[in-house]
Amino acid sequence: MKNIIFLIALTPLLLHGQTEELKQRTSLFLQEQSETFKIKELNGSEPDYGILKETQFIFHQYYQLKQIDKEINELGNSVRPKYDLSTFAYEDEEELKYALKFWFKEFIGHKRITPGRDYKTVYHVEPAVIIIEGNTISILTLSCYATDIEEFRDWRSTMLGVFGSPNAMVVEIGCNGPIEWTKNSPDPKDPNWRR
């Protein structure tokens, strides 16, 4: 009986520790970007991530990064690109896996995807870098018209440096597709990922 009471008392501390690590990583990422971007923590107007927000996460943050200086995009317009950063934490890796299975049924762009399988075209999606690590999901959404391939690679590298590890899964989404699993992709034939 004492063990059960001890476990019940310990559970909130463990969950707090997991969310605290994600908060620290997010804070580090935002601090690295603070010289170039104006950063706002927002409650609404988050990009459409499919049904991810319907999953049972224990912690969620959303930030918008708007570039301070204007730049010329590939269409020749002077713009201040904006980027969206969303982070989600789950109770444990099993909860994350359950959430991913649910999310993949209606992924970004309302596309049903199979884990580990790439897709060439997905209409109405913005470029994004998704890092799935431990019990967290971190998503950085970029602009189709303000992002070139070099900038995309820089963002991917920065995201991996802060939110990733050698075991992190990385999903990259281009403007209107493709969706590519570029690091530690799951085996599409693995029965653990079957719906």
Name each model feature, range by range.
Residues 3-16:
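Sec-dependent N-terminal signal peptides
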Residues 15-84, 89-195:
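Soluble, non-membrane globular domain cores that form compact, hydrophobic packing
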